[in-house]
Every structure is written in C-alpha cells, then in structure tokens.
C-alpha cells in the first residue's frame, strides 16, 4: 500500500466530537485519502469537512460496521480509525467485535483511541510504502477438507 489510502472511520456517539476535533487537527494529512465512514459519523464529517473525500456507509447498528468489515476482508480498506466509547453499552456489540476482529485478522492498522490515531496519522508509513504481513490461513481453511 502506498500513497492514497482507504480509511474507515467510526465513532460512538460520545466520541463523535473527539473524532471531529481529531480530523480538524489532521485535516491536511487526511485530504489525500478516501474516507469510508458509518452513518452519523459520515454525515458529520461531510458537513464539516467538504475538502475530504467521504463515502457514507449505513449506520453502525444498521450494518455499517459490517460494510466496513466486508471491505477489510476484500482488501479494500487500508486502515481503521474507530473511536470507541468504553463506558456505554452498544446494542450491536457483536458487529463491533466482528469489525475489530477482521482488522486484527487482516492485519490492517487500527486505532481505537485518539493517542493511537495520532501515532498512525504521523507515521511515515501513512504516505510511504508499506506492505502488511498477512498470515496464511490456508491450513485453517483446509482443516476439514474445504477447498
């Protein structure tokens, strides 16, 4: 992966303002990239940051988290910024866990808090060449004779 990145962005309700503030602070670094954001988060980003290329997905509880997960599994999402509210229950917790699991499984850079997001956005790999190491799961897939 080099140059323009496809970035997933999600923020729980209590973290949306944090994400908007973070995007404002890092706007110039984000402009060259494509952002795919769930529901309300995507709408807020579009309202405030017309310079960004934003593709809105469905709301997280309505399938947006799963849409981003599908993009990860298909190799179409390069990184994920997901500001999580650890203090609130989430009715779609299983969808959230599935999204986080896919980010780990496919070894994409993922930030779940602002500090990690700061480290990712300032990394030389953000605009430079980076080829993530992907584990070969062929033995797992073939364990029961699947092809």
From Swiss-Prot:
Purpose: Catalyzes the formation of methylglyoxal from dihydroxyacetone phosphate.
Database matches in HAMAP family: Methylglyoxal_synth
Alphabetized UniProt keyword annotations: Lyase
Annotated GO biological process: methylglyoxal biosynthetic process
InterPro entries reported in the protein's UniProt record: Methylgl_synth, Methylglyoxal_synth_AS, MGS-like_dom, MGS-like_dom_sf
Family: Belongs to the methylglyoxal synthase family.
Transmembrane segments: none
E.C. numbers: 4.2.3.3
Protein name as catalogued: Methylglyoxal synthase
Entry-linked PANTHER family: METHYLGLYOXAL SYNTHASE (PTHR30492:SF0)
Residues the record marks as active site: 65 (proton donor/acceptor)
GO MF term list: methylglyoxal synthase activity
Pfam families listed in its UniProt record: MGS
Span of domain MGS-like: 1-147
Enzyme type, top EC level: lyase
GO CC field: cytosol
Binding of substrate, residues: 12, 16, 38-41, 59-60, 92
Catalysed conversion reaction: dihydroxyacetone phosphate = methylglyoxal + phosphate
Gene for this chain: mgsA
């Amino acid at each position: 992966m080099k140059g323009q990145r496809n970035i997933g962005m999600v923020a729980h309700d209590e973290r949306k303002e944090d994400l908007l503030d973070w995007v404002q602070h890092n706007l110039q670094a984000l402009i060259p990239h494509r952002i795919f954001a769930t529901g309300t988060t995507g709408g807020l980003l579009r309202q405030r940051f017309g310079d960004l290329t934003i593709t809105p997905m469905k709301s997280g509880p309505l399938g947006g988290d799963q849409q981003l997960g599908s993009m990860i599994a298909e190799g179409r999402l390069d990184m994920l910024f997901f500001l999580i509210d650890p203090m609130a229950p989430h009715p779609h917790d299983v969808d959230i866990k599935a999204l986080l699991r896919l980010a780990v499984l496919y070894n994409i850079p993922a930030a779940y808090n602002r500090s990690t997001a700061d480290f990712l956005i300032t990394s030389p790999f953000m605009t430079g060449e980076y080829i993530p190491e992907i584990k070969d799961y062929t033995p797992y897939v073939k364990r029961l004779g699947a092809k």
